[in-house]
Regions:
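One-carbon transfer enzymes
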Residues: 1-163
Length: 163
């Protein structure tokens, strides 16, 4: 919010703690986004599961960045450091990040972009998390947003075509 304010972009808060349920928060969020005539919702570090109301209001217009190469280490319970802990515990040699459209299944929407990151000997979850952010997430999320805003993404079922 501070960065947006410095750039002259208005910011609004719809806080989960202000609502009795996740559904109520999501409905309030949808109402605010519609009021502002928002065409794209970007989730980055958003750790709440959105309910069907949000997905229905913004079909193929919600982008999420996930810190793994979906379909690995994704879905319920796989967020933040948990993702990197799981990748290290499994012994995979590559991880990375995925930008995908949000649907009603956690981390289950059509994949827009992915970028791989090598796991190095001695990595900790914290070190790996930072490297995935720097080498993958921070590159592919703005790229996906640009593609969307340029009208260069076409979704057919699970497949996202880049035009």
């Amino acid at each position: 919010l501070e960065r947006a304010a410095r750039a002259g972009i208005p910011g609004y808060v719809v806080a989960r703690k202000d609502f009795a349920s996740n559904r109520e928060m999501t409905i309030a969020l949808v109402d605010k986004l519609r009021e502002l005539n928002i065409g794209l919702v970007v989730l980055a570090g958003f750790l709440h599961i959105l309910t069907g109301e949000m997905v229905a209001a913004f079909p193929n217009a919600i982008l999420n960045v996930h810190p793994a190469l979906i379909p690995s280490f994704c879905g319920a319970g796989y967020y933040g450091l948990h993702v990197h802990e799981a990748a290290l515990a499994y012994g995979v040699k590559l991880t990375g990040a995925t930008v995908h459209f949000v649907n009603e299944e956690p981390d289950g929407g059509p994949i827009v972009l992915q970028k791989a990151v090598e796991i190095l000997e001695g990595d900790t979850p914290e070190v790996l998390q930072r490297r995935v952010m720097e080498q993958a997430e921070w590159h592919i999320l703005p790229q996906a947003v640009s593609l969307f805003c340029e009208g260069r993404l076409r979704v057919e079922g699970r497949i996202v075509h880049i035009l």
